[in-house]
Each structure stands twice: as C-alpha cells, then as structure tokens.
Amino acid sequence: MIIDELEKKVQGKGVRIVFTEGWDPRVQKAAIDLKNNDVVCPVLLGTPEEIAGCAQKNSLNVEGIEQIDPNNFEHMDEMVRKMVELRRGKMDEEKVRTALKSTNYFGTMLVQMGYADGLLGGATYSTADTVRPALQLVKAAPGNKLVSSCFILIKEESQLIMGDCSININPNTDDLVEITMQTAKSARQFGVEPKVALLSYSTMGSAKGECVAKMTEASDRLRRIADFD
C-alpha cells in the first residue's frame, strides 16, 4: 500500500517534516507516532503555551519532539529578507513580518530555506490558507507550467490517486494533460504504476459539451505522448 511504501522510503533518514498546527491534538498524536517509529523527524509549530496546553489537556507527551515558535525564531531576519526577495515588491518588510506570524507562511519558508524537507497542514486551516503560501513562495517545479494537487483514497486493498481536486478550477486541455502527467509521476513516486482515467459527466459519449470535449482531446493527446495506460 502507498502509506507503507512511503514509510519505507523515509524511515530512519532524518527527514524533517513541519506540522503547521502544533496545537491540534490530532497533529500531536501523529507526530508522536512518527517519532516513536523513526519514520520522520516531526517539527511542531506554535507557541510553547499552545503546544504544551494541548498536550496537557489531551494527556500527550511531546517531550523530545522539536518545537519552533515563530515569535522567537533566531533566523527571523534572514527569513524576512528572503521572503521579501521572493515576493518581488508585492510585500514590504512590515507585511512580510505580519504574514510570518501565521504558521502556514512560517512553515513554508522553513521548507523554502532548507530548514525542513516538507510541510503538513490543513487540520484546522482551510485548503486555500494552506496552499497559498506554497504557490507564492515555492511555486511550480522546474519544467512545469502549473501547480496541481492529488488526493490518495484508500479503502481496504483498493487505492486511488485523484488529481486535481483543489487547485485548478477550470483547466483547459493543455492544463489537463499536464495535470495528468504530474499525477502519474506522483503515483510512481508513491510506488504505484499508473493506469489513468479522465473523468467527466459523459459516459461513452452519452453527453456533449465543452468539458467533455476538453477531456476527450486531452485523452487523445495523452495516448500519443504518455508512457502509461
């Protein structure tokens, strides 16, 4: 299964993952489990009062798990300079310092600057608030024109990887091709050989329309260029 394969890839390698909602009991439980099993090195973001208060209230032991308070980060000035540079005139220093009080922006900058390898968020933050900092500060990987997302759905022995359910609202044909290629690449990174279907509201030509036409054209193009079924 995908989760097992991912654990094998990172276990014992000291991969640092930032958790933006270190005050949430679900996040703390996950961080404790990941650390105890040496899967990753979790980093909880939040104030000491928030993190300790949650742990005490829920009888959780977060001792030994790294914690970073955005209000007392020793490299904050360096982070501010870097973020001002990345925003290219869209945010001045004052606005950047305000934004970095949010653990979403702060955590994203930790990843961007190499202090962490990845970020997990969305337990309490909305999808938009979780994704926006990455779109602004990390952006698309080299060779990609857009950023897309994928969901992993697991039920018993079945697993599906679905993209793109949260980023691109009305993709055109070119976008659909790129999203499909990105999702297939992600599947392989997860240890799954992709077998792809493009979904719309038409079944075997039962309906026509712009959305159906885009999917049909994207499917035809992918059959010619893709190295998957």
Q: Language-model features: where?
A:
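Anion-binding alpha/beta catalytic cores of soluble intermediary-metabolism enzymes, centered on
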Residues: 1-229
